[in-house]
A protein has these predicted regions:
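Catalytic cores of secreted/periplasmic lytic hydrolases that degrade extracellular macromolecules
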Residues: 12-181
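Hydrophobic h-region of N-terminal signal peptides that target proteins for export
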Residues: 3-13
Length: 181
């Protein structure tokens, strides 16, 4: 009976997580595709990072400050801020008016950061190279960070959005397809 209860609870938690992830993907995939078109960052990477860093939109940072990527203030940030406990207590994080601003700033953050420049030499469909490169460049402190986005990308087939991000026409038809689901 205990084993059955454990399996049932685990299954319900996995389904809830899957539902949250699927809802996040449905809601934010168009933004990730748009960012890919504008900045040449794989949509799969942007979505996987958003899912990870925001807890599929349920983290305190995402809910209270629209920060979907866990980006800290840094020395040159002049926008809104929020305090949050992370690696240390009461750290400064960027705050945004809406999720779209967070997605745009994430792209700008990667494009402007010299430590990420080598990533833009990778193929746009090389999500594994991007994930490993983000870890190598110091995007996150988690030692297993590179594997986490790769697993999400493969489990949720986010790599499909990378090819859809190639043209604006494809993105529009894809958005119509998403709305039908």
């Amino acid at each position: 009976i205990i084993a059955f209860l454990f399996i049932s609870i685990t299954t319900v938690q996995a389904q809830r997580r899957n539902a949250r992830y699927n809802e996040y993907i449905k809601q934010y995939a168009p933004l990730a595709v748009e960012q890919m078109q504008r900045h040449k960052i794989p949509a799969s990477i942007t979505l996987a990072q958003g899912l990870l860093e925001s807890g599929a939109g349920y983290s305190e940072l995402a809910r209270k400050s629209n920060n979907h990527f866990g980006i800290k203030c840094g020395g040159n940030w002049r926008g809104r801020t929020v305090r949050h406990d992370d690696d240390a207590r009461n750290e400064c994080f960027r705050a945004y008016r809406n999720p779209k601003d967070s997605y745009e700033d994430h792209s700008d953050f990667l494009k402007r950061g010299a430590r990420y420049a080598f990533l833009f030499k990778l193929k746009i469909t090389d999500y594994k190279g991007w994930a490993r490169g983000l870890k190598k460049a110091g995007y996150a402190t988690d030692p297993s960070y590179a594997n986490r986005p790769i697993t999400i990308i493969e489990d949720y087939e986010l790599y499909k959005y990378d090819s859809r991000g190639m043209s604006k026409r494809d993105a529009r038809s894809w958005e119509k397809e998403l709305k039908k689901k």
